Design a protein with these regions (language model features):
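Substrate-binding/charge-relay-adjacent region of secreted/lumenal peptidase catalytic domains
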Residues: 8-106, 112, 117-373, 395, ...
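Short clusters of hydrophobic/aromatic residues that line enzyme substrate/ligand-binding pockets
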Residues: 362, 391, 408, 441, ...
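An often Trp-containing, charged/polar helix-loop segment at the C-terminal end
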Residues: 418-419, 469-519
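A short, ordered amphipathic alpha-helix with a cationic face
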Residues: 1, 62-65, 504-505
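Sec/Tat signal peptide C-region and signal peptidase I cleavage site
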Residues: 3-7
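Phosphate/diphosphate-binding glycine-rich loops and adjacent basic-rich segments that engage nucleotide
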Residues: 383-394
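Predominantly extracellular beta-rich ligand-binding scaffolds that present long acidic/polar faces
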Residues: 333, 342, 368, 378-384, ...
Length: 540
């Protein structure tokens, strides 16, 4: 886990140097010019984390005090956030080292600063080199040693010291995949209501929920994005499929990030499909909040400190230098009744390759819901669920970063010889939804079919959770928050088969879909009002 620099002079941090640098796999090409401006997010650790962990356990336990009693940002900060005194000391340290404070954070977890490479090297006693990337045709910059600093305040992490891993969206397109894979075959049968029998977002609502009264009223969904989007592509989709768009789409610029396309042309496929899929599942939600930023720490932290959307979705993958970097924020999500769904990746089983590592994070973190993908067949266009098998590109397996297995996966019966899961490390995914090469998308000014990926599954689950929380609120309850402790209890319970569609056929090249939990599609896909009633109580 992340190593905290304790209160002593020249305190050293860990997990800031890339393995490619320490091993020599990345050849050093020179030094980063000292005038280069870098944006850093300095993170402080939580306080009383043991107490917070107990609070989170109680949050999901009906017999415990604090059951489903979410905290406000102010309450979380007062109880578990860094102190104002420590935050101020870090601010003064930054300014004393010629680092400009770009933004502060209400929860005091993140301090955003900007400075020259020369000043950053001096402040943290390191050298930032330029290296040849070992697996990509480009160079990257990174520190050659761990940061040490003259500061009597503990730090959690300093984000932004390297650009080794570039985030990428977790979707695929049939023409591209067919050209590169001789074994590729088109999904069959096709039962969608869109052009070419492709699936529309509304088909997912019909298949996984039905025609009931829940529509997301009063709820918001938050979408995590690294690039901006064009709203015209969203409206193009709904106009093309002849459906109304009654949900406000609101862009949230994180630290000044551009909300629209940064150039005359940009690929906003990921952003558009996230928006469309979430809205289609909950077509009367209050708003879809599209958080656009340049680094994961700032985007996630903005979602937490806004604390508006209780259902969040991330369909991007990257390989962090420290796999625990975002944990303080993920725990704040849970304490505030927010739930993050993360796409599990589109390259099959996690087998330790660089591509798998880029796909697995953040989905293999234990404090969020990892979402795999399936091939769904409905009972005709716009019809109910009929059958479902595993999508063989669905990411899953034990954590490549060897993150410790969480308590909810240690429940009796979850990990067994049939699913071949790990008893030591976090297993992914947790749940799944449709994501085969049979989805219709509008982006970059045009529309086409043949799109796939766990990128579709994650926002579909976020939209579905808006329905769950809508019913919970109508029943006089608070938002459910982090779902995994609840889902896994359902999974080992007597009503599992009625609450989930258990995926028992197919594989992701290493792991098989089996009865119960598996490392291809988790517990499976949502079974409409049955699952909603199990989580939110029957509608009154």
């Amino acid at each position: 886990m992340a190593s905290i620099a304790h209160a002593e002079q020249h305190a050293a941090l860990t997990h800031h140097v890339r393995q490619a640098v320490t091993s020599g796999r990345a050849a050093r090409m020179g030094s980063l010019p000292g005038t280069t401006q870098l944006d850093l997010a300095i993170m402080l650790p939580l306080r009383h984390e043991g107490d917070l962990d107990r609070l989170l356990l109680n949050f999901a336990d009906p017999a415990a005090p604090g059951y489903r009693e979410p905290l406000s940002v102010k309450e979380f900060t007062a109880g578990y956030g860094p102190t104002q005194q420590d935050y101020d000391k870090v601010s003064r340290f930054a300014e004393a080292n010629n680092l400009t404070i770009v933004a502060t954070s209400p929860n005091r977890i993140v301090l955003d600063v900007r400075g020259s490479a020369a000043d950053i090297e001096k402040a943290f006693h390191l050298s930032i080199g330029v290296y040849q990337h070992p697996t990509e045709n480009r160079t990257f910059y990174a520190p050659d040693r761990e940061p040490t600093l003259d500061l009597d305040v503990p730090l959690w992490h300093i984000s932004g010291l390297d650009n080794y891993s570039r985030p990428h969206p977790l979707y695929k397109h049939r023409p591209v995949e067919a050209n590169s894979n001789p074994d590729f075959s088109n999904p069959s049968p096709l039962t969608g209501s869109g052009p070419g029998r492709q699936y529309l977002g509304s088909d997912m609502r019909a298949a996984y929920y039905g025609s009931g009264p829940l529509d997301g009223t009063g709820q918001s969904v938050g979408l995590f994005e690294f690039l901006g989007y064009e709203l015209s592509d969203v409206t193009l989709y709904f106009q093309t499929v002849n459906q109304p768009l009654n949900v406000a789409v609101k862009g949230v610029s994180v630290k000044g990030a551009k909300l629209g396309c940064p150039a005359k042309f940009c690929d906003d496929t990921e952003q558009d499909l996230d928006i469309v899929q979430a809205i289609s599942m909950a077509p009367a939600m209050t708003e879809a909040l599209v958080y656009v930023g340049n680094n994961d720490v700032d985007i996630f932290n903005q979602m937490a400190t806004d604390n508006i959307a209780k259902q969040l979705s991330c369909s991007w993958g990257w390989d962090p230098v420290d796999s625990n970097i975002d944990d303080p924020i993920f725990k704040e999500f849970a304490a505030q009744g927010q739930n993050l769904f993360a796409a599990s990746g589109d390259n099959g089983a996690y087998v330790g390759t660089n591509k798998n590592n880029d796909d697995a994070w953040p989905a293999d973190d234990a404090n969020l819901v990892s979402v795999g993908a399936t091939h769904l067949v409905t009972q005709g266009a716009g019809g109910p669920w009929d059958s479902e098998i595993a999508w063989n590109f669905s990411g899953g397996g034990p954590s490549p970063a060897k993150l410790r297995i969480p308590g909810y996966q240690q429940l009796a019966g979850v990990i067994n010889s049939s699913n071949a899961g790990s008893t030591a490390y976090r297993n992914a995914p947790d749940v799944a939804a449709e994501g085969d090469f049979d989805n219709f998308v509008c982006s970059d000014g045009s529309c086409s079919g043949g799109w796939a990926g766990t990128s579709f599954a994650a926002p579909r689950w976020a939209g579905f959770m808006a329905l769950i929380n809508q019913q919970a609120v109508a029943n006089g309850r608070k938002p459910l928050g982090f779902l995994n402790p609840l889902i896994y209890r359902i999974g080992i319970g007597s009503n599992y088969d009625s609450d989930f569609h258990d995926i028992v056929s197919g594989n992701n090249t290493k792991f098989n879909a089996v009865v119960g939990y598996d490392l291809v599609d988790g517990w499976g896909s949502m079974n409409g009002s049955n699952l909603i009633d199990a989580l939110a109580g029957k509608a009154k």
